[in-house]
Amino acid sequence: MSQVIATYLIHDEKDLEKKAEGIALGLTVGSWTDLPLLEQEQLRKHKGVVVSVQELEENERANRYFGKRLKRGIVRIAYPSLNFSADIPALLTTVFGKLSLDGEVRLLDLTFSDEWKRKFPGPRFGIDEIRKKLDVYERPLLMSIFKGMIGRDLTYLSEQLKQQALGGVDLVKDDEILFENELTPFEKRITAGKAVLNEVYEKTGKRTLYAVNLTGKTFELKEKAKRAVELGADVLLFNVFAYGLDVLQGLREDDEITIPIMAHPAFSGALTPSEFYGIKASLLLGKLLRLVGADFVLFPSPYGSVALDKEEALGIAAELTNDKEPFKRSFPVPSAGIHPGLVPLLFRDFGIDSIVNAGGGIHGHPDGAAGGGRAFRAAIDAALAGKSLHEAARENEALRKAIDLWGAVEVTS
């Protein structure tokens, strides 16, 4: 029988076995031992089952936080798939709906049967197809971000885009807070961006993709996305957690929306940071986003300005790129506070199949965005060649200026 197994971290004063059994029954058939035998037989296939309870050592920091001594443990519960439809809202409401309001419980992971996975699309393009679009195969990709666009017009956008592309970046994305507005409306951003990037391509022979921010009311998104495709948009940036995972899946599954989708983590910080509550980042930003169809996933790096715990960040990347899953791999995009001096760390931890994403690290370069792009490309080349950044900087002025400004982290093998 197909099932979904949920893994939780639970803190509780009670016996953890009883707590787990209460969850398994409460989120499925409601009660068991007081049911007549005939009803038990009828409901058995719907009953949640405790798979395991692993009691952990007490955590003094947790006890101080809660102001009392609590037992803690890892609990795994199997939910029969026939209890809920094969969609994310039904899944999350079952395994962590009212349970998320009931005590000290954190959802760590979900394990799906192969049958259940087949109900979901995964990325339309994934890492390999995006590399084909760019004709870049043997290095991490480089992405930059529009900055300071609120209150600016299309002329400013076009020039900023041009400078970023001339610096050698592979992708440029809108700021996630750039919404529909009179100065840079959605459709005109696409057409202006396309003109600029075609001009740069004719000059340099290098392709750059532009991720335009898809925003607006939920039930208008599909038509807006289809219009973007008609206008020649390259990629859709999407603030998925402001809308819901199911909305991203709906965009992915529409056969008229034939361009990659880039998932931004905005608002996910309301769900993931606590070690006692919420959802583990590797599940929310990794496994689930890949399941519903994100081609790229942004998340905080372990060493930038909005740092995520290293284990959590690596866990997200692992879920996005695990080649044992039946889906195409999603591009991990560790972000926030990235400058050229951090490239050796990014390369060591996330490897070739990742994207180096920078905003201020591009635009804040002494030679502007084009210089920032050149500095990053030199840093990436150095990491690939096993050269130190300081050694590479002796041969590249843009990288030298970046290191003088931000410093550099050298990684020893």
UniProtKB/Swiss-Prot annotation:
The active site is at K98 (proton acceptor). GO terms for biological process: carbon fixation; L-methionine salvage from methylthioadenosine. InterPro entries: Diketo-Methiopentyl-P_enolase, RuBisCO, RuBisCO_lsu_C, RuBisCO_lsu_C_sf, RuBisCO_lsu_fd_N, RuBisCO_lsu_N_sf. Coiled coil: none annotated. Pathway: Amino-acid biosynthesis; L-methionine biosynthesis via salvage pathway; L-methionine from S-methyl-5-thio-alpha-D-ribose 1-phosphate: step 3/6. It catalyses: 5-methylsulfanyl-2,3-dioxopentyl phosphate = 2-hydroxy-5-methylsulfanyl-3-oxopent-1-enyl phosphate. It holds the Pfam family RuBisCO_large_N. It is an enzyme of class 5 (isomerase). Keywords: Amino-acid biosynthesis, Isomerase, Magnesium, Metal-binding, Methionine biosynthesis. One of its GO terms (molecular function) is 2,3-diketo-5-methylthiopentyl-1-phosphate enolase activity. Mg(2+) binds at K173, D175, E176. Its EC number is 5.3.2.5. Catalyzes the enolization of 2,3-diketo-5-methylthiopentyl-1-phosphate (DK-MTP-1-P) into 2-hydroxy-3-keto-5-methylthiopentenyl-1-phosphate (HK-MTPenyl-1-P). This is 2,3-diketo-5-methylthiopentyl-1-phosphate enolase. It comes from Geobacillus sp. (strain WCH70).
